[in-house]
Design a protein with these regions (language model features):
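Secretory targeting and sorting signals
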Residues: 2-30
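Sequence/structural signature of beta-propeller domains
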Residues: 28-365
């Protein structure tokens, strides 16, 4: 099930493997420029035959991705109201679906892996922390534990916010315990939940940016290095969908308690930004380099941290022919682990053809 409106045509040719390069813009500071960074796009799973190494009908409009330290990759399949798991060894050109686990929930978007002891679930006889937690476009927070819940069956709905449309989810540790952060696109705010799934009352200033133009709302939220990054897109209040277009987007960085640290990016190459990830260390970019993926045009922009605070535009991923990389319907960006994909790989998810299909793959150096 998808709650999203249609009619946003976007055509991009896909292949199983294609070459990409990161090209710094001519305006970048010369003494801090980096040579072109060549990477590969490896398409591993799709619902369509011939588009990737593995075909899986469940993978329609895969949105959020998450990984535990040693788990397979979890995908939120918005189009089939499911979450499925995939294994892929570092450097592999194939992926395997885990057949023993399939979690169902309505229109999932963002998701997180929970390594802690909070967010406890119980079935009356057994209690254990949720290991994976999801946000949905129906305004719900859902959770699942292999010790408590069926391996093939529904996730537990733990919180429902009337009128909310959650597009993204993050998890962070604070002085008051672990917290969930949900990007409530329809109501234009970040909703926070404690480790018992109870809503947290925020100060009036929390996760507020007075410089943000009217009509922009949190489209995604991501925890990176203990900081909370929020990607903003222009809201269509009639459909609760984003309004894509060149320059339509902002990214902010906050503390875990919601204090604005800096504006990361404004307009420019942003186009309904959603994917947020740090560059893998093996790619040779400065520590803290941020990748921002656009849902609107499928481009990935690179922002380099400044020694004086803030971030600098540092180019976009391009293919080896010099064309800007475009992944149709791009959603998540997520660094791999030593067991799933490798720490030098960046997983991506996408809902091509106006979210009617799905693609899961990696970007590798």
């Amino acid at each position: 099930m998808s709650l999203r409106s249609k009619g946003r045509p976007f055509a991009v040719a896909t292949a199983l493997v294609s070459g990409l390069a990161l090209i710094a813009p001519a305006t970048a500071d010369a003494h801090r420029s980096h040579p072109p960074l060549a990477v590969q796009q490896v398409n591993l799973v799709s619902d369509q035959a011939g588009k990737a190494a593995l075909q899986d009908a469940d993978l329609v409009n895969p949105w959020g991705l998450s990984l535990g330290a040693t788990t397979p990759l979890w995908s939120s399949n918005n189009g089939t109201s499911s979450s499925t798991l995939y294994s892929s060894a570092p450097g592999s050109s194939t992926a395997t679906k885990v057949p023993t686990v399939r979690v169902t929930l309505p229109a999932p978007t963002g998701q997180v892996s929970n390594p802690g002891t909070g967010f406890v679930l119980s079935n009356g006889t057994t209690s254990a922390p949720a290991r994976f937690i999801f946000a949905t476009e129906t305004g719900q927070i859902a959770a699942w534990s292999p010790q408590v819940d069926a391996l093939i069956g529904p996730a537990e709905i733990k919180a429902t916010t009337p009128g909310a449309v959650y597009k993204g989810l993050a998890l962070a540790t604070t002085g008051s315990g672990d917290r969930l952060y949900a990007a409530n696109f329809a109501q234009q705010r970040i909703d926070v939940f404690d480790s018992a799934f109870h809503p947290v009352t925020l100060p009036h200033w929390a996760f507020r940016d007075s410089r943000l133009p009217r009509g922009y709302a949190p489209f995604n939220v991501q925890t990176l290095n203990g900081r909370i990054f929020v990607a903003y897109a222009l809201l269509d209040a009639q459909t609760n969908d984003e309004i894509a277009g060149p320059g339509r987007g902002f990214v902010d960085e906050y503390t875990a308690d919601g204090r604005l640290i800096t504006r990361v990016a404004s307009r420019g190459t942003l186009n309904a930004p959603w994917g947020l990830a740090l560059a893998p260390a093996a790619w040779g970019l400065p520590a803290g380099t941020l990748f921002v993926g656009n849902f609107g045009d499928g481009h990935i922009t690179v922002f380099r941290p400044s020694a004086y605070g803030g971030y600098h535009f540092a180019g976009q991923l391009r293919d080896t022919n010099g064309r800007t990389l475009a992944i149709d319907g791009l959603w998540a960006l997520l660094q791999g682990t030593a067991t799933t994909g490798g720490t030098d790989a960046l997983w991506f998810s996408a809902g091509p053809d106006d979210e009617t299909h799905g693609l899961l793959g990696q970007l590798r150096r």
